[in-house]
Structure formats: structure tokens, C-alpha cells
């Protein structure tokens, strides 16, 4: 039986909104102006950055439609050891009882079996996931992801 995995940042958690509040600029603009090192340094210094992220506007719509499939949250970590606990607590707060796996983004594929489905907003993760026989759904919003997921799973109308 195929497993459904949901990425966290950009699918369930609004990383960009949370990062903008800390950085004072949109994440890409801050990174271009100050560099990737300073970007992550500022976020790492923010108390409970990941735990405090708001939900994406349509996160609950997506999750409720797939809850019966027992999805697993599969989320990438930045370098360092500061983010995993925050992400685990965030998932427990917003999606109690849902399993979460924290890993380096490049290692997400190590959790896939052939046919498993990953919903992720970062298209750059597609090749590694598909290389192991997984199905990649590029998340733009809940409606389009649910339409695509309906090819692989029975989707709840809510």
C-alpha cells in the first residue's frame, strides 16, 4: 500500500510569512541582499521560529481531505541542531497524533518506497523522489494538490 507524505514548510506551515516577520523582507529578497548564511543565522536566532509558524491558509483543507490516509509529515531541516524539536512540536500542536519525520531535504527519498507519494512545494525535490520510484505532487495550493492526489488515493470531500 502506498504511503502519503506531506512536506511541512510551504505545504502545511507558512514558512515565507514567518520568515518575513523575522527578517523584515521576503525570504528571497533577504537572501539576495544578505546571503544564505545570514538568512539562516537570523532564523536560527529567533526563539521558536519553526514552532511559531502559522498554518498555510488552506492547510486544514488539504489535511482534512487526506487525514483518513494517515499521512506522514516529511520535513527538511536546515543545518545545525536547532530546528527538529521546533518542527516536531509544531506538528503536535497543529496535527496531533500525526507522525512526523525530520531529515535533511536531500534525504527525504530515503523514506520512500516505490509508489509512495510526496506533496512538496519545492520542485527541486522531484528528481530525487522519483528516482526511487516515488510519485511527486508539486504543491501550489490545496485544490490542485487534491486533484492530483485523487489519481492515487480516495480523497475525502471533508
Model-derived features: where do they sit?
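Hydrophobic anchor at the start of a short beta-strand
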Residues: 70-72, 98, 136
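Active-site neighborhood of HAD-like aspartate-dependent phosphohydrolases
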Residues: 1-44
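Short, acidic loop-to-helix structural element flanking the phosphoryl-transfer center
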Residues: 31, 45-73, 80-85
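Short amphipathic alpha-helix with an adjacent loop that forms part of the alpha/beta core around
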Residues: 109-112, 148-157
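Acidic, Mg2+-coordinating phosphoryl-transfer loop and its flanking beta/alpha structural elements
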Residues: 117-150
Amino acid at each position: 500500500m502506498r504511503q502519503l507524505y506531506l512536506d511541512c514548510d510551504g505545504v502545511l506551515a507558512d514558512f515565507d510569512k514567518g520568515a518575513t516577520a523575522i527578517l523584515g523582507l521576503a525570504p528571497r529578497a533577504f537572501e539576495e541582499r544578505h546571503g544564505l548564511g545570514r538568512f539562516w543565522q537570523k532564523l536560527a536566532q529567533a526563539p521558536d521560529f519553526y514552532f511559531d509558524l502559522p498554518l498555510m491558509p488552506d492547510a486544514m483543507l488539504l489535511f482534512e481531505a487526506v487525514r483518513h490516509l494517515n499521512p506522514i509529515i516529511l520535513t527538511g531541516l536546515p543545518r545545525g541542531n536547532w530546528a527538529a524539536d521546533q518542527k516536531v512540536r509544531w506538528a503536535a500542536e497543529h496535527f496531533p497524533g500525526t507522525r512526523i519525520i525530520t531529515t535533511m531535504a536531500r534525504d527525504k527519498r530515503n523514506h520512500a518506497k516505490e509508489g509512495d507519494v510526496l506533496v512538496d512545494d519545492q520542485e527541486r525535490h522531484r528528481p530525487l523522489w522519483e528516482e526511487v520510484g516515488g510519485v511527486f505532487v508539486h504543491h501550489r495550493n490545496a485544490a490542485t494538490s487534491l486533484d492530483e492526489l485523487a489519481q492515487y488515493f480516495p480523497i475525502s470531500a471533508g
